[in-house]
Amino acid sequence: MASRQVSPVLVNRKLLFAGIFLVSLSGLVLEVAITRIFSAAIWYHFAFVAVSVALVGLGASGLVVQHRVKKLKGKWAENLTIYAAWGITMFVPITLFVMHALASQVIYLPLFMVLFSVPFFLIGIIISSAFNAFASVAGRLYAADLVGASAGALLVVLFLVLTGGEGATLVVGLIASISGVIFSRIAKNTKKTIASLAFVAFAISLILLNQATQIFAIPTDPTAQKDLPIYLREHPGSKIVKTQWNSFSRIDVVEGGTSSEGLVAKVFIDGGAGTNIISWDGNVS
């Protein structure tokens, strides 16, 4: 016999609202982080692609839940929220690594858009499933959704400064895995709770690994007609010696490859806006 769908009366509502809060938070963090990544890796005007990617993923998820998923029997809402949370945790690093491996080349932009739309699709699956299963508390769910989105819009600034664009995106996977733990507790499923905790550990390890090795570092498209790749192509021997993110851009410092007197290094903002760093002996005369 199929399992009976959990009634909102029997669900720990605080956990339910906390889960939706975290999922919505992760969605806004991801959307803003993508704008920064696309701007630095390809061109600044591709930053707005993030909005389209988010709308496609979220819109498709609503259609799927409305016309397909509701036909499933048993605790479909519980299972979908848990599996979708795991999927976000897995798919975010896969997407980053693909973009890293393909060197962010603009010819692969459609692929990057499809890959980044998948986490939004899964985020939408979670939120749509919750609204369908617990319509009686839709108002409070919506409030949790809005508060989470607001918090995400603020916290992403901190994540970008502390972990960079790639790190902030990996944080999305961590937040999603924590929501998976919450949804597993709602379902009172010990095995899935343990599995969700394993995903939390996995997400944390990826963040730490990236901080130590920059394994997910996304370069500027080497074929783009931007200041950074042009300078690297025209000056053999030059190399990026430091990369630092802030809340609105990525800064790359390049040294070597030039014999210009007094030129110590060049600084690039989002792969463009090249600026010289000139040596100075401190003598004002």
For each feature predicted by the language model, list its residue ranges:
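Alpha-helical transmembrane segments of multi-pass membrane proteins
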Residues: 2-285
